[in-house]
């Protein structure tokens, strides 16, 4: 049995044994509000994603938006019957898509903006108290500058909005 004084400590040129080489880096599959703010340039009142609950690198993300009566657009849209404007539902889906785009290898930190929207349809009203669950899937990316995504927004399992979103990387 060895005593503490008999155990040889690593010298300055020796490194303690670790299993870093055999452990692959952990793939992040969720993002908090604070982490989203490090990835997207949007801030209140225009940051429309509260958290990412599922993320598959280079493929898709699922984000959550908790809709509350305290949001400024409800003051005028509409005073006696508050509805989340459709354009903000589309923007919320696009922000979830932005998480996918900004995490693509070699494009980290890039600023992606809307290049177009197609086939957008609104199927259900979104009102204060709803939780909007948005799933955005990358369909393709060209020349590492343009991308197209399929997006869906649901409330309580019911489709609220869907459409195709196009993005462009700006310098």
Swiss-Prot record:
GO molecular function: (3R)-hydroxyacyl-[acyl-carrier-protein] dehydratase activity
GO annotations of cellular component type: cytoplasm; membrane
Region (Disordered): 1-25
SUPFAM superfamilies named in the record: Thioesterase/thiol ester dehydrase-isomerase
Enzyme Commission no: 4.2.1.59
GO annotation (BP), single: fatty acid biosynthetic process
Domain of life: Bacteria
Enzyme class at the top of the EC tree: lyase
KW Nucleotide-binding (keyword) present: no
Keyword Cytoplasm assigned: yes
InterPro entries noted in UniProt: FabA_FabZ, FabZ, HotDog_dom_sf
Signal peptide residue numbers: none
Bias (Polar residues) ranges: 1-22
Subcellular location: Cytoplasm
Active site: 77
Keywords: Cytoplasm, Lipid A biosynthesis, Lipid biosynthesis, Lipid metabolism, Lyase
Catalytic activity: a (3R)-hydroxyacyl-[ACP] = a (2E)-enoyl-[ACP] + H2O
NCBIfam families: fabZ, PRK00006.1
Family to which this protein belongs: Belongs to the thioester dehydratase family. FabZ subfamily.
Family matches, as HAMAP family: FabZ (MF_00406)
Biological function: Involved in unsaturated fatty acids biosynthesis. Catalyzes the dehydration of short chain beta-hydroxyacyl-ACPs and long chain saturated and unsaturated beta-hydroxyacyl-ACPs.
Name the UniProt record assigns to this protein: 3-hydroxyacyl-[acyl-carrier-protein] dehydratase FabZ
Protein's organism: Nostoc sp. (strain PCC 7120 / SAG 25.82 / UTEX 2576)
């Amino acid at each position: 049995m060895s005593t503490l004084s008999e155990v040889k400590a690593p010298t300055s040129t020796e490194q303690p044994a670790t299993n870093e080489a055999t452990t692959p880096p952990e793939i992040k599959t969720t993002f908090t509000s604070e982490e989203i703010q490090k990835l997207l340039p949007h801030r209140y009142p225009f940051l429309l994603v509260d958290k990412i609950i599922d993320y598959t690198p280079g493929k898709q993300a699922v984000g959550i938006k908790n809709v509350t009566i305290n949001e400024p657009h409800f003051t005028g849209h509409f005073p006696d019957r508050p509805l989340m404007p459709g354009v903000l539902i589309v923007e919320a889906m696009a922000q979830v898509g932005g998480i996918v785009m900004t995490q693509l290898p070699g494009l980290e930190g890039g600023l992606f903006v809307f290049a177009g929207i197609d086939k957008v349809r609104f199927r259900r009203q979104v009102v204060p108290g709803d939780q909007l669950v948005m799933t955005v899937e990358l369909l393709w990316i060209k020349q590492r500058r343009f991308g197209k995504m399929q997006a869906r927004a649901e409330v309580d399992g019911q489709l609220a909005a869907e459409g195709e979103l196009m993005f462009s990387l700006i310098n």
